[in-house]
């Protein structure tokens, strides 16, 4: 998952919203950790579950990474508006774990990644990732670099 995050970083730019979904332990934060490495941001990317959101400034001239865990939010745009994500969106890459039904109103352009673990004891590390690009931004984007 970490390597997938590094590859994903090559596609992203300021203004991008990435929504991650999958069961607990699927690898959402691990993917985001790789994304942070690929974007070259400062600080270790860890789960923002208890603080809801963390901002990781760029070490270079790239966009900062805003990492949000919406798991504990009850839903609706009101709670998300309190995080001022609409203000951060234009100059940051925003990654939201558990954001379905909560952040879609921020922008029509978003990239959704659904992470599923393979079933069975021997397949613990196998993940299946479904990538869906929505909106004009992703209509012509080549997401084939994510395969591997």
From Swiss-Prot:
Q: List the disulfide bonds.
A: none
Principal localization reads cytoplasm
Where Mg(2+) is bound, by residue? 29, 97
Instruction: Provide the GO MF annotations for this entry.
Output: ATP binding; metal ion binding
* InterPro entries the UniProt entry points to: P-loop_NTPase, T6A_TsaE
Q: Which UniProt keywords apply?
A: ATP-binding, Cytoplasm, Magnesium, Metal-binding, Nucleotide-binding, tRNA processing
GO biological process: one example: tRNA threonylcarbamoyladenosine modification
Where is the protein situated, by its record's location annotation?
A: Cytoplasm
Q: Which residues bind ATP?
A: 25-30, 125
GO CC annotation: cytoplasm
Report the family membership. Answer: Belongs to the TsaE family.
NCBIfam families (alphabetical)? T6A_YjeE (TIGR00150)
This molecule's function is given as: Required for the formation of a threonylcarbamoyl group on adenosine at position 37 (t(6)A37) in tRNAs that read codons beginning with adenine. Is involved in the transfer of the threonylcarbamoyl moiety of threonylcarbamoyl-AMP (TC-AMP) to the N6 group of A37, together with TsaD and TsaB. TsaE seems to play an indirect role in the t(6)A biosynthesis pathway, possibly in regulating the core enzymatic function of TsaD.
Q: What is this protein called?
A: tRNA threonylcarbamoyladenosine biosynthesis protein TsaE
**Per the UniProt entry, what species is this protein from, by scientific name?**
Streptomyces coelicolor (strain ATCC BAA-471 / A3(2) / M145)
């Amino acid at each position: 998952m970490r390597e997938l995050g590094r590859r994903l970083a090559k596609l992203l730019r300021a203004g991008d919203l990435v929504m991650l979904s999958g069961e607990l332990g699927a690898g959402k934060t691990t993917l985001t950790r790789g994304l942070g490495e690929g974007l070259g941001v400062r600080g270790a990317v860890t789960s923002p579950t208890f603080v809801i959101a963390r901002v990781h400034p760029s070490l270079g001239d790239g966009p900062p990474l805003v990492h949000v865990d919406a798991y504990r939010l009850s839903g609706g745009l009101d709670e998300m508006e309190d995080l001022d994500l609409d203000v951060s969106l234009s100059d940051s890459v925003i990654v939201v774990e558990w954001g379905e039904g909560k952040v879609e109103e921020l922008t029509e352009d978003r990239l959704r990644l659904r992470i599923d673990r393979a079933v069975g004891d021997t397949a613990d590390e196998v993940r299946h990732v479904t990538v869906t690009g929505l909106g004009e931004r992703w209509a012509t984007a080549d997401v084939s670099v994510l395969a591997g």
